């Protein structure tokens, strides 16, 4: 209870596989029939499950698992922040570093230092973003889903991190 882990499911209501896609099926459904959703979830004390993020979005910084959603949820409490996405970017020393991409409320201004201090004042030091980027929009697909892998690719270019250790971006 109260620990994040991958949400898996098995039962008569779970698909047997992807149509004519054996590789995708093998990646999603293990030999015991468990569907690996790719979602991070936490079981509450009452026995309910709460989705807390996506495994592929998890940042591993110096061996620490950092859940972007936790930092995003906190940054939404900043009065100047309209929208935020937290991503992992490659880093030679730690493997990955935290980057917060922030859309400010109309008419607001802020600084990287202000955002970092706000996080440092309320969260563990290892959760403070190394990079803060103020943007006007996030890349999205036709269905309106935010494309974090596109954000990672753009960040690598913008920060000139091509030589840092490679991370999976999709």
Predicted regions and their residues:
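AMP-binding/adenylate-forming catalytic domain of the ANL superfamily
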Residues: 123-145, 162-170
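AMP-binding/adenylate-forming catalytic core of the ANL superfamily
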Residues: 5, 10-11, 16-17, 24, ...
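Conserved ATP-binding loop and adjacent catalytic segment of the adenylate-forming AMP-binding
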Residues: 1-5, 13-16, 26-34, 159-165
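Short, small/polar residue-rich loop motifs at catalytic or cofactor-binding pockets
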Residues: 35-37, 133
């Amino acid at each position: 209870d109260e620990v994040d882990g991958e949400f898996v499911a098995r039962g008569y209501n779970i698909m047997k596989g992807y149509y004519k896609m054996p590789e995708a099926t093998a990646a999603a459904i293990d030999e015991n029939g468990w569907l690996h959703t790719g979602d991070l979830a936490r079981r509450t004390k009452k026995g309910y499950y709460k989705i807390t993020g996506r495994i592929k979005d998890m940042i591993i910084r110096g061996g620490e698992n950092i859940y972007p959603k936790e930092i995003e949820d906190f940054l939404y409490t900043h009065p100047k922040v309209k929208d935020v996405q937290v991503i992992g970017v490659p880093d030679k020393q730690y493997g990955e570093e935290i980057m917060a991409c922030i859309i400010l409320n109309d008419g607001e201004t802020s600084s990287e230092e202000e955002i970092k201090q706000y996080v440092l004042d309320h969260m563990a030091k290892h959760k403070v973003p190394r990079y803060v980027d103020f943007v006007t929009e996030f890349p999205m697909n036709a269905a309106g889903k935010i494309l974090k892998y596109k954000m990672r690719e753009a960040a690598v270019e913008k920060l000139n991190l091509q030589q840092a250790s490679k991370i999976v971006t999709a």
